Amino acid sequence: MRTLWRLIASFFKWTWRILNFIRKLALNAIFLVLVLVCIGIWSQFSSTTSEHAARGALLLDITGVVVDKPSASSKLGVIGRQLFGASSDRLQENSLFDIVQTIRQAKDDRNITGIVLDLKNFVGGDQPSMQYIGKALREFRDSGKPVYAVGSSYSQGQYYLASFANKIWLSPQGEVDLHGFATNGLYYKSLLDKLKVSTHVFRVGTYKSAVEPFIRDDMSPAAREADSRWIGELWQNYLNTIAANRQITAQQLFPGAQGIIDGLRKVGGDTAKYALDNKLVDELATSTEVEKALTKQFGWSKADNNYRAISYYDYNVKTLSDQGSAIAVIFANGAIMDGEETPGNVGGDTTAAQIRDARLDPKIKAIVLRVNSPGGSVTASEIIREELAAAKAAGKPVVVSMGGMAASGGYWISTPADYIVANPSTLTGSIGIFGVINTVENTLGSIGVHTDGVATSPLADVSSTKALPPEVQQLMQLSIENGYQRFITLVANARKSTPEKIDQIAQGHVWTGEDAKANGLVDSLGDFDDAVAKAAELAKLKTWHLNYYQEEPTFFSMMLDSLTGSVRASLPAAIQAWLPAPVAAAAETVKAESDKLAAFNDPQNRYAFCLTCANIR
């Protein structure tokens, strides 16, 4: 018996020792990683000089997507990449303004003698963002320094940036994949019918198509007509820019589906030769041949065993002066939600607080609101608008810079501005409001579950498990109609028009920036630089600096966001890994749609949101 007890005691003793060893090992490993990260952060950010020892190229090796305002986890991903060459399945976000600032600094850096665009890991960005980067690349070229693009193949987004280069190399086995733009969404009516879900839709606006997925299985003719117009304009703008850069015609660049098929047939299906023959690229070359050419241009680095170049992620950008008068830059990037900001979304309370801080700061002389949003909560949009109006009333000029989209609620928050600058390819307008309430009384009834009770008023008897009372439906529709009238009145007052005239161009209609200028919804066409210059002009500033209002996350908050985000990202990825490719693709689409719906948290269930704007690809 004693032997048995000794064996049991020995088992628990060794088990504890093993667990304790693992615990200590894990804690020490975490501590070591934290020390290395802190050292790396200090070494990366303590230096403010942009000079590096050897002359060479700036390697613009952008990984992931370009956005106005990257999330905290993306910033941590950049640090991890710099320190350990770490990679992640999560899509890395890169700041548009950091990229442009880097290119402009490199233009004046005597040690940077050119730029190499290596875009194999670049996913893309909205068209106005790409144009802004292209503008910086053109300025770099105009300074007398060359820009080269290298790639085994080019997607549409990659090729757009590559077109700004002096020379484009393409692999002999590669292609330039031009196919056009599309906007697609899921429609749920048949599914909801099969599930016996009762859908109650409240909306104002002929073209307010955000509710169509709940009540149709396809696009309405009005939505198809409107979307065909603006997506065609975006595609034409895309072609015109590249054609001008390549000094060819838009027809030569993209002769249509049949034209491409006929052209490929002439060269036996050789996509690389087709690209060369049609002047889409300048030369077909293997990676070895490209390396030789770049080595001849920039020299050889023994340390890197490659041509001399410094990665965009390793290039130290000088800290700009923060002395004197400032122009505040506040971001409204993503769907507008009620409450605090979450990654990828605009928090009504968070953004309003930033505007208030800028209003009360005596050093801030003007505000530029950078809007890149399809809209969202009406309540949150109004909270932001009111605070922006207060800043304007306090005597601080307010200028709105519209990015890829400033539609619906994104336009609502723009109305107090003294001046609105949009890109020709901005998607804006979509002036309309909707609400959707789904109830599942029939679904539950089909399996024998019913809801019953008493209430002092039909207005109190609201539940997703019961039929929506007619009185509540009437109140909802009245609320939506009131919200729409308020929306067009705000626009009319801001644009010095009348509600009747605004109603003619509203009704949920999406406009490109070019059309919005013609309709009087924006003041001028331009980019972020133009908006800043206008703000300085209105504030009568001769010198100024920009103060970007974005909360810098702590290291631990970045770690937490990264870990939770990785879990959120890895679960769907793990599930999709077991699915056939077509099913996995559909699952990813469903997830993207559900993420959009998750941002709908308006307390009054009223939304000014442009669904099609967020679906373009």
Regions from the PLM with identified roles:
Residues 446, 540, 545-550, 610, ...:
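C-terminal recognition in membrane/secretory proteostasis and scaffolding
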